[in-house]
């Protein structure tokens, strides 16, 4: 299992391919009881999960997950797998293998959208019925080069394995994609082709276009484009699949020697051509017909002379004409583009379209029977002209060839008459033949285009053939398809189960071979063997008088009761008739044999074929150029030789099918197959749903459960010996001895023998141990128990060890403390002794003597080192000389090795050539054998035909004899008649005498004749009146058809407009969502990229630092000269070895080349020699590495002594290193030629070095990052603390934000309500459209009835004409008899009298006949009158229907208008909401800003209050004697209370004002400007107050001093105070008047600003009570500060406003300075304060007035909004009522439709009864029609009322939509912004995709290198152990050398 990081390469497809690491861990840790968790059989769901409750006497009680309790037998309970097997990727690995385990594993994976699962060697895929992101380019890249076990299950994995097998095994591959119809075979085929087209060109340049200009795309584009073209002409909708392939195809993709695409070809099988002329009710014909009529390319409609309505063409409209999941317009463009890409010429392209159109016109050809003959004649030539024009034929010739074909009889051509039925059958056969031959020609043309003539070596074939089909009506096509699937299933069984059992034999396991593949042999033999179904069918086709009944009887005689697979079908009521049933592997299929003989013979009109051959259209002439041999051609482009081989003019469809099937099976047997089994999860095409019975049936049919069967009999679980030993060694470690080598197989045998398990449940193979199902799970449980015990013991021992260690430390610490205490006590006792003091003085003097001794020894050592240095210098010079010679020898050795490598390459090339010639010879042998088989078949057929011709010749001889006899008889009769003529002439002469007697009789006859002529004239008058009525009816029908056509066009236009609007709306919504998602993703990716860039920059800096370090290391590496000196000696020794080995290798190479030439391609000796050479090279390399390591160890000691003298040899060391690296590289290249792995090892070693460097740099970075991290951590701590403070302060603002969001949610709910109403209106519109369609169908049916009546009338006219002809014939006979009697009267009077009597009788009979005809004409006249009345009634119904349709159209247009207006309103409301939110936020920020400024002013006023309080105290001391002072204080207190009350009211009103602010839209900007002005004014005035307070303080001090010094100043100040008091009282009165006026104006204004006014009044008038208000304001200040922290971002937007405020503040400061000079006395100060107060009050009163206006407007807006909401609610209710009414009307319409259908049936019956004289039924039907007309009129009245109500609603909706105009403008601005963002997002997305692609490729390279690195590390470990041994030896040798010296 891969980790989450490895799954990241799959991108967003990862969760759809494999469980995440967290899910896997959770599954393993989930509680599970293996003894009680089971699957139990259950009748409804087949199997359910449950837990065992009890077991009693073979019965088991189980409680299911649903809570039900079941009691079943033991064999109906199946154990459940442990949780770690949940959603397992390979079901063959499960512990318990049975049906429910497989079913639930597929179900759980399907529920998680993991649709691919392995089951042993093949892959199971379940159709998801939805798009999944598992086929994207990054997924293709992720699967490339991956082994099957390395990646999740996928069709790409199967494809890549086939590709890799082809490259490595040099064998052709095939991928068989099978399953039932609708299981997803075609989609998986397309994915396989997509994968090969992607990976086989990666890294290659696009192929250049051929100079001829035919190819419009690259080869991979053409391979992919072939699929849409084939799907358009070969796929159709069936009952089970909307895009079912109605032909089989085997696509071969050829690859060159390098694995790149070379070419491709396609073989097709069994195109279902009957679908061209016939479809079932729920199906439709091939897609191309509906693509053309989709009107996506109007020029096609004009060119093909067709309409856009498929119902105009019977061949393509017998079933459905549209498919919900297919867009025919888009598919037409894809088909057209594919034709261009595939290189079809423009002429060929036009021919394809024209032939397709001609097939459609063929269905409209009509023929009628000639009068008094069985000969057919054309019924109109318009359609024939169109068809002939499209095929470049003569219309008259075409019709003549169809009605009068020429047939060769003997040596002459005879014109043959055809009946209407025969001509219709011939037209259908021609249409099928043209379509089939065109399809096969297109396939051949595609193969011609895909054949690039490039060298190709192997191919991969992809088989996509129609799945098993069981329909209600199954014909010959279904038998062929099901037989093909039967053969493929047999091939699958043989391949899968034989391989499984061959592996047992290969591993040496005793096994009895079981032939599972023979299970299907009985059914296959029944169909294809001699005297089988196909054989009997072909035999019947040989006999001219054979019929379907004779064929059926032969089948019954031959097989019924004799073959178990052949049965008589059961008769089921309501189901199509069936003649026999076959038991296939997928179920029992009932077949109907009607028309099989004709289908099998497939005859064509040879005269028309001759016209085709002479056609001016080259393509058509080419299709039928080999008409006699065309029937023998193969069904695919690859089977071109089939027709030429057969060469006969008569080959049946079944024989051709069997021939192609045998070729397919031969192809498959010559390849290595890969199987993909597709599963249908449910019949309803519901994503995510799985029907248990259906899936189990398919699993049984597909062989999945058959594979489980062999797994249960065999050994499904298998593990390599080494893996088993490693994993399960813990079960009994003593069984495998430690410290000695033991083979993994023997270790596994010992281990299993020592475990208490059933030893018959496993077998030992050569490389693996095989287990029965379930045993591996038991071993897992035992291992878990053992691990639990071991871990418990380990924990106990660890804890004991730690406790003992801690105890030992405590003991050691205790002893050390005792020791230290003892020594200190002893020292304290002796430190005052005199001797001890002497010792302390002498001790330091002893060190100088020791240092002198050490200096002497160091000098001696220095001398020795100097001598050794001189010796080493001499040695170094010698080694340098040796190194030069060694370098020359190395170069020579290198040249020799290179020569050997060239010889080896030549040998390998010769070997490859021999292998190629062998393959070519084998291919030629296969071709020769195939030709021989074909020739044998041809001979057999020729002999059979010879016998048949001999029989025919004998029959012809008999016919000739009979004709000769009849000729003789005819001659005798001729002579007799001549004699009679002579006698008659003699009698004529005698008859002349009797003329006179007959004159009287002649007159009587003339009178009778005149009477008949009069009667005939009356009949002709009646006929004329009938023809006039007929013409009138035809005109009415034409008018109705024209009106119906207009209605259809209108309806189609409306539907297109509606679909376009809905599509645009959905696209807009989806695009917005996609843009938002992509924006978030891109933001995240940008952050990641920025982080990566910063990391890369830091890495670059580290690399620079590393470069400096490497320069230092270069100097250190110079010390390795001594190592290289030792290596020189080793190189000499290795050179001798290499020389010897080289000679041996060259000799062996010559022997190998001779053997190869003698053996003609035998490569086994070459492989063995390669292995030997590889081993010898490995030995050489190990010897060289050992010598190198040995010398490194020896040089380590010398490096310490000669470190100073090595600097000069640095350059030489570098040269030696380069030489060494070059030699190693050359060795690795030689090894790479022998074995490809050597190059990987070299790259891995380099990567390892780079990684080590990167590791060192990363360590340095890590240390730096740690320091940075600590600093960042400190900053983070500071920031977190600050954030905590900010969060506490932001609580209040978040609460207000929640309130605003609640309001937004309320508005969004309103928006959703509107959208729901819009959806409801859409639904009603769709229902109205459906009703309109139903009425259109009714009109069409009534037209059909009119046609039937017209045909009956024509038949009556024809019968009347026949009677007239009979009458005229009788008159002529009378005249003849009269003349005869006149001539013979004299001689034969008596005979004439008798003739006269006879003539009179005949005349009487004729008259009676005329009377009967007249009666019949009268009855027909009455019938015609009645039918005419009915037609007029129907016309009235049609007119009413048209009126209803017009009303519905009008209603639909009104609904469209309402829909558009509501859309516009919703968009404008949304924009209005966003604007109001934005403006509310800005207003809130401005409000909080003003509050902030105001609270700052309050802080400044605090000092003012304190100073004013002191001043008031002084003034109160001075004014104690004034009686008026108390009165004033009392009044001020009243005012204070009143102001406080107003304050409370203002606070309550503030909340209401904040709520109402949300509804203000247009006035907010003006308020903001005014608020800015107020703020600047307040700031200015606050600054003035600050300065005034300071000045007041100074003035008050001076005044107090002056008042104390002089009484005059006191009196003056007292008078001033009295004057001030009076003035303030007057000012106070004025202020009260202004205040009352302001209160009246601001009654409905913003209470927030009134609160501010109250606070200002309270501060200025009652300074002594300001402390309490100050505390309240402090609380408010705290709240505002918390809000301000949240709104800091918005404050930045208002900086411009703040700058303006700063400028006004500076002006105010200047004014404050001027005022401070004027304010010197208390009187002037108080006066200025009062003036300021007045100004503020006037400003505030103005603001309040304006706010009152704003609030009034807000209330008006609210009332309008409420009124609009109530209106919308009323409209919603009325719309709901209208919807109910529409639903009722819809139901009535459906009833009417059903009634109309019943009436049509009854009308047909009534017409038949009318012809027979059934007048009672006609009267009943007429009464019923009148009742229905009354009901239709009542329904029309209701519809009119509904339309009136809708018009009222439309007016209301228009009134509401006017309010959404501004929102629409905002949405346009937003749309522009979205477009810009979309452009940016696309650019970001493109960059991100490029980056992801690059990262994926790098990641793949990294994984590959990592894998190679692991292998190199293993080899390095082995080499390291050997190096250590050599180092030990080298140290010993070095010590010996030193000791000897």
Swiss-Prot record:
Comp. bias regions, Basic and acidic residues: 1130-1149
Modified residues (N6,N6,N6-trimethyllysine): 130
Positions of modified residues (Phosphothreonine): 64, 69, 419, 1243, 1257, 1288, 1469, 1503, 1519, 1732, 1738
Chain segments carrying region Disordered: 1128-1149, 1155-1174
Modification type Pros-methylhistidine: residues: 759
Main localization, broad class: cytoplasm
List of residues binding ATP: 179-186
Region Actin-binding, annotated ranges: 661-683, 763-777
Residues covered by the IQ domain: 787-816
Assembly with partners or alone: Muscle myosin is a hexameric protein that consists of 2 heavy chain subunits (MHC), 2 alkali light chain subunits (MLC) and 2 regulatory light chain subunits (MLC-2). Interacts with GCSAM.
Family in the record: Belongs to the TRAFAC class myosin-kinesin ATPase superfamily. Myosin family.
Protein name per Swiss-Prot or TrEMBL: Myosin-2
Gene symbol of the encoding locus: MYH2
């Amino acid at each position: 299992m891969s980790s989450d990081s490895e799954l990241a390469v799959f991108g967003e497809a990862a969760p759809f391919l494999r469980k995440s690491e967290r899910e896997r861990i959770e599954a393993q840790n989930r509680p599970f009881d293996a003894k009680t968790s089971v699957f139990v059989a259950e009748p409804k769901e087949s199997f359910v999960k449950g837990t065992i409750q009890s077991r009693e006497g073979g019965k088991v009680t189980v409680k299911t997950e649903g809570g039900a309790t079941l009691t079943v037998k033991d064999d109906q309970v199946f154990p459940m797998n442990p949780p770690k097997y949940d959603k397992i990727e390979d079901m063959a690995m499960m512990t318990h293998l049975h049906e429910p385990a497989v079913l639930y594993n597929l179900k759980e994976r399907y529920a998680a959208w993991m649709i691919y699962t392995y089951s042993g060697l093949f892959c199971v895929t379940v159709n998801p019925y939805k798009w999944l992101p598992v086929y994207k380019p990054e997924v293709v890249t992720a699967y490339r080069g991956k082994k099957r076990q390395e990646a999740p299950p996928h069709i790409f994995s199967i494809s890549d394995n086939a590709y890799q097998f082809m490259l490595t095994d040099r064998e052709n591959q095939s991928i068989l994609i099978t399953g039932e119809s609708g299981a997803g075979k075609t989609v998986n085929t397309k994915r396989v082709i997509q994968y090969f087209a992607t990976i086989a060109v990666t890294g290659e340049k696009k192929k250049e276009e051929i100079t001829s200009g035919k190819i419009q795309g690259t080869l991979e584009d053409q391979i992919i484009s072939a699929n849409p073209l084939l799907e358009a002409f070969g796929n159709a909708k069936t009952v089970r699949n909307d895009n079912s392939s109605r032909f089989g195809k085997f696509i071969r993709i050829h690859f060159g020697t390098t694995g790149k695409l070379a070419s491709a070809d396609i073989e097709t099988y069994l195109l279902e051509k009957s679908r061209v002329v016939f479809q079932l009710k729920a199906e439709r014909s091939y897609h191309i017909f509906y693509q053309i009529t989709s009107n996506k390319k109007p020029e096609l409609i004009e060119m093909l002379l067709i309409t856009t309505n498929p119902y105009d063409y019977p061949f393509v409209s017998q079933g459905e004409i549209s498919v919900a999941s297919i867009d025919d317009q888009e598919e037409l463009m894809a088909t057209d583009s594919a034709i261009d890409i595939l290189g079809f010429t423009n002429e060929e392209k036009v021919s394809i379209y024209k032939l397709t159109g001609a097939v459609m016109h063929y269905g409209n050809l009509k023929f009628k029977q000639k009068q008094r003959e069985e000969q057919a004649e054309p019924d109109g030539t318009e359609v024939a002209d169109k068809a002939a024009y499209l095929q470049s034929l003569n219309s008259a010739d075409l019709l003549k060839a169809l009605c009068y074909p020429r047939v060769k009889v003997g040596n002459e051509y005879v014109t043959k008459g055809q009946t209407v039925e025969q001509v219709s059958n011939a037209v259908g056969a021609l249409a099928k033949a043209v379509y089939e031959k065109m399809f096969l020609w297109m396939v051949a043309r595609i193969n011609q285009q895909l054949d690039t003539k490039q060298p190709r070596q192997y191919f991969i074939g992809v088989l996509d053939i129609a799945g098993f089909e069981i329909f209600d009506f199954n014909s010959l096509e279904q038998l062929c398809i099901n037989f093909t699937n039967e053969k493929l299933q047999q091939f699958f069984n043989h391949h899968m189960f034989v391989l499984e059992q061959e592996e047992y034999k290969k591993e040496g396991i005793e096994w009895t071979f079981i032939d599972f593949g023979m299970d299907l042999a009985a059914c296959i033999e029944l169909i294809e063997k001699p005297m089988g179904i196909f054989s009997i069918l072909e035999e019947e086709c040989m006999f001219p008088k054979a019929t379907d009944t004779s064929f059926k009887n032969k089948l019954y005689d031959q097989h019924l009761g004799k073959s178990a697979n052949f049965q008589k079908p059961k008769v089921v009521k309501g189901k199509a008739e069936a003649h026999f049933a076959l038991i296939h592997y997928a179920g029992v299929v009932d077949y109907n044999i009607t028309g099989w003989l004709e289908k099998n013979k497939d005859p064509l009109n040879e005269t028309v074929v001759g016209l085709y051959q002479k056609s001016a259209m080259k393509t058509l002439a080419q299709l039928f150029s080999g008409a006699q041999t065309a029937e023998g051609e193969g069904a695919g482009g690859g089977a071109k030789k089939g027709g030429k081989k057969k060469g006969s003019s008569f080959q049946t469809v079944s024989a051709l099918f069997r021939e192609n099937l045998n070729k397919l099976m031969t192809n498959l047997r010559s390849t290595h197959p890969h199987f993909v089994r597709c599963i249908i999860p449910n019949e309803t095409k519901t994503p995510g749903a799985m029907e248990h019975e259906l899936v189990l049936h398919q699993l049984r049919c597909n062989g999945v459960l058959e594979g489980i069967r062999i797994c249960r009999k065999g050994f499904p679980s298998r593990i390599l010996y080494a893996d088993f030993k490693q994993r399960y060694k813990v079960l009994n470690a003593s069984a495998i001895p430690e410290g000695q080598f033991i083979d993994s197989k023997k270790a596994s045998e010992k281990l299993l023998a020592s475990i208490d398990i059933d030893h018959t449940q496993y077998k030992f193979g050569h490389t693996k141990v095989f287990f029965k199902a379930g045993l591996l799970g038991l071993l897992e449980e035992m291992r878990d128990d053992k691990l639990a015990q071991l871990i418990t013991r380990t924990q106990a021992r660890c804890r004991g060890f730690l406790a003992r260690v801690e105890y030992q430390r405590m003991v050691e610490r205790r002893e050390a403390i005792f020791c230290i205490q003892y020594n200190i006590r002893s020292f304290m006792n002796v430190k005052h002794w005199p001797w001890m003091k002497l010792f302390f003085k002498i001790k330091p003097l002893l060190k100088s003597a020791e240092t002198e001794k050490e200096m002497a020894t160091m000098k001696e050592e220095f001398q020795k080192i100097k001598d050794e240095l001189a010796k080493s210098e001499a040695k170094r010079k010698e080694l340098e000389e040796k190194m030069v010679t060694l370098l020359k020898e190395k170069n020579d050795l290198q040249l020799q090795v290179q020569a050997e490598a060239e010889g080896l390459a030549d040998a390998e090339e010769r070997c490859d050539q021999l292998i190629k010639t062998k393959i070519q010879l084998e291919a030629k042998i296969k071709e020769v054998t195939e030709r021989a088989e074909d020739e044998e078949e041809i001979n057999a057929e020729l002999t059979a035909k010879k016998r048949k011709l001999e029989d025919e010749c004998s029959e012809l001889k008999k016919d000739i004899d009979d004709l000769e006899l009849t000729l003789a008889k005819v001659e005798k009769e001729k002579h007799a008649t001549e004699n009679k003529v002579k006698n008659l002439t003699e009698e004529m002469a005698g008859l002349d005498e009797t003329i006179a007697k007959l004159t009287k009789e002649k007159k009587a006859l003339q009178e009778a004749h005149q009477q008949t002529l009069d009667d005939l004239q009356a009949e002709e008058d009646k006929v004329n009146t009938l023809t006039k009525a007929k013409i009138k009816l035809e005109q009415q029908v034409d008018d109705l058809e024209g009106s119906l056509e207009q209605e259809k066009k209108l309806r189609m236009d409306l539907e297109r407009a509606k679909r376009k609007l809905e599509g645009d709306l959905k696209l807009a919504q989806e695009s917005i969502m996609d843009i938002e998602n992509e924006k978030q993703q891109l933001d995240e990716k940008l952050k990641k990229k920025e982080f990566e860039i910063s990391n890369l920059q830091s890495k670059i800096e580290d690399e620079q630092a590393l470069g400096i370090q490497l320069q230092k290391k270069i100097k250190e590496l110079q010390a390795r000269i001594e190592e290289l000196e030792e290596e020189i000696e080793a190189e000499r020794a290795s050179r001798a070895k290499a020389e010897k080995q080289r000679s041996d290798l060259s000799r062996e190479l010559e022997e190998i080349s001779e053997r190869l030439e003698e053996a003609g391609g035998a490569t086994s000796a070459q492989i063995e020699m390669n292995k030997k050479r590889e081993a010898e090279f490995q030995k050489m390399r190990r010897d060289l590495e050992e010598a190198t390591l040995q010398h490194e160890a020896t040089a380590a000691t010398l490096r310490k002594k000669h470190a100073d003298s090595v600097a000069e040899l640095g350059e030489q060391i570098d040269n030696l290193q380069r030489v060494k690296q070059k030699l190693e590289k050359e060795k690795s290249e030689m090894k790479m030629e022998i074995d490809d792995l050597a190059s990987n090892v070299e790259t891995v070693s380099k990567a390892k070095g780079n990684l080590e460097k990167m590791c060192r740099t990363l360590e340095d970075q890590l240390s730096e990052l740690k320091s940075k991290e600590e600093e960042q951590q400190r900053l983070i701590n500071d920031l977190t603390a600050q954030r905590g403070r900010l969060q506490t302060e932001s609580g209040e603002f978040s609460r207000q934000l929640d309130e605003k969001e609640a309001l937004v949610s309320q508005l969004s709910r309103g928006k959703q309500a509107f959208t729901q109403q819009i959806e409801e209106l859409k639904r009603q519109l769709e229902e109205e459209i459906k009703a309109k369609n139903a009425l259109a169908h009714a009109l069409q049916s009534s037209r059909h009835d009119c046609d039937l009546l017209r045909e009956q009338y024509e038949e009556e006219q024809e019968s009347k004409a026949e009677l007239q002809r009979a009458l005229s014939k009788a008159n002529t006979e009378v005249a003849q008899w009269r003349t005869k009697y006149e001539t013979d009267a004299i001689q034969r009077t008596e005979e004439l009298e008798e003739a006269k009597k006879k003539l009179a009788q005949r005349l009487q009979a004729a008259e009676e006949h005329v009377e009967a005809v007249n009666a019949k004409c009268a009855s027909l006249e009455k019938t015609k009158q009645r039918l005419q009345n009915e037609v007029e009634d129907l016309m009235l119904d049609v007119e009413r229907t048209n009126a209803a349709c017009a009303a519905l159209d009008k209603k639909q247009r009104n609904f469209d208008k309402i829909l558009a207006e509501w859309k516009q309103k919703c968009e404008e409301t949304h924009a209005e909401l966003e604007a109001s939110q934005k403006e509310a936020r800005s207003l809130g920020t401005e409000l909080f800003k003003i509050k902030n400024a105001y609270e700052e002013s309050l802080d400044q006023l605090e000092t003012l209050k304190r100073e004013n309080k002191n001043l008031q105290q002084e003034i109160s001391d001075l004014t104690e004697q004034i009686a008026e002072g108390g009165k004033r204080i009392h009044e001020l207190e009243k005012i204070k209370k009143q102001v406080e009350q107003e304050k409370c009211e203002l606070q309550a009103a503030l909340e209401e004002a904040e709520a109402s602010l949300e509804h203000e839209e247009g006035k907010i900007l003006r308020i903001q400007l005014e608020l800015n002005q107020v703020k600047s004014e307040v700031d200015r005035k606050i600054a003035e107050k600050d300065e005034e307070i300071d000045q007041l303080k100074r003035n008050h001090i001076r005044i107090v001093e002056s008042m104390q010094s002089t009484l005059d100043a006191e009196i003056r100040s007292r008078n001033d105070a009295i004057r001030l008091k009076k003035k303030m009282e007057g000012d106070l009165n004025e202020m009260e008047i202004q205040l009352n006026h302001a209160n009246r104006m601001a009654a409905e204004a913003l209470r927030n600003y009134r609160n501010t006014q109250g606070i200002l009044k309270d501060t200025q008038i009652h300074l002594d009570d300001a402390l309490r208000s100050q505390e309240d304001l402090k609380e408010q200040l705290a709240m505002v500060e918390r809000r301000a922290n949240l709104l800091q971002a918005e404050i930045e937007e208002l900086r411009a406003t703040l700058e303006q405020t700063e400028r006004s503040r500076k002006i105010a400061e200047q004014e404050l300075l001027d005022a401070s000079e004027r304010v010197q006395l208390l009187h002037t100060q108080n006066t200025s304060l009062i003036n300021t107060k007045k100004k503020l009050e006037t400003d505030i009163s103005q603001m309040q007035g304006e706010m009152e206006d704003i609030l009034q407007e807000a209330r008006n807006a609210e009332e309008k909004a409420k009124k609009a909401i109530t209106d919308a609610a009323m409209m919603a209710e009325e719309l709901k009522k209208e919807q109910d009414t529409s639903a009722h009307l819809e139901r009535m319409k459906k009833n009417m439709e059903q009634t109309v259908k019943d009436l049509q049936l009854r009308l047909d019956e009534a017409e038949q009864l009318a012809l027979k004289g059934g007048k009672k039924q006609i009267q009943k039907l007429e009464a019923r029609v009148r009742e229905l007309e009354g009901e239709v009129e009542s329904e029309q009245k209701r519809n009119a009322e509904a339309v009136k109500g809708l018009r009222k609603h439309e007016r209301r909706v228009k009134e509401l939509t006017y309010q959404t105009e501004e929102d629409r403008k905002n949405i346009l601005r937003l749309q522009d912004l979205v477009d810009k963002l979309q452009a940016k997002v696309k650019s970001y997305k493109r960059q991100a995709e490029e980056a992801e692609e690059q990262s994926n490729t790098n990641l793949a390279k990294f994984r590959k290198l990592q894998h190679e690195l692991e292998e190199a590390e293993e080899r390095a470990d082995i080499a390291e152990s050997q190096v250590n041994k050599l180092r030990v030896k080298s140290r010993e040798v070095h010590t010996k050398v030193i000791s000897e010296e």
